[in-house]
Amino acid sequence: EQIQAAGIGVATAGPAAIRETLSLYGVIAPNAERVREVSARFPGVLRSVDRKIGDAVKQGEALATIESNESLQTYTLTAPLGGVVTQRSANAGEQTGEKSLFTVADLSTVWVELSLFPRDLAKVRVGQTARIRSVDAGLSADGRVVYVAPFGSTATQTLVARVQLDNPDRRWAPGLYVNA
């Protein structure tokens, strides 16, 4: 009677598959293959800046208007892909020079940079599925290991295992810590 009240059950032991799991920690990062630095095609003066950090942009939308130093004609600097403006180094009236004026990141997929200790290196392979959980356990999703670093960090004595994660709702924000 006490066993039933405690919710304890009895079952017959038999053959089953054992799955080894590994607990890792990491951070969300933009998918570097979906990040673009945007510079002026021709040197000139920024006449207007149309976007700020955090703005969503579609491919081809205006980021700024520049007056060319050579032709004195204005041209529009456009977003090379749809995403979010993550950096801006442009203000109206400034010379463009050769610097990057904007960074645009498509966050529909993100990378999870997991810290992998050398003793665990043999347990992680490209192609494996990884369950990613937010630190507060509010979010959970499965991704695939797409890269395991062939070299480690002297500062942390770890290697990077990279998981690609679909992020259609933009709920996995770069910079946040996660568990895997």
For the regions a language model picked out, list residue spans one by one.
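N-terminal beta-strand block that forms a small beta-sandwich/beta-barrel module immediately after a flexible targeting
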Residues: 1-40, 89, 142, 146
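Low-complexity, intrinsically disordered
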Residues: 126-142, 170-171
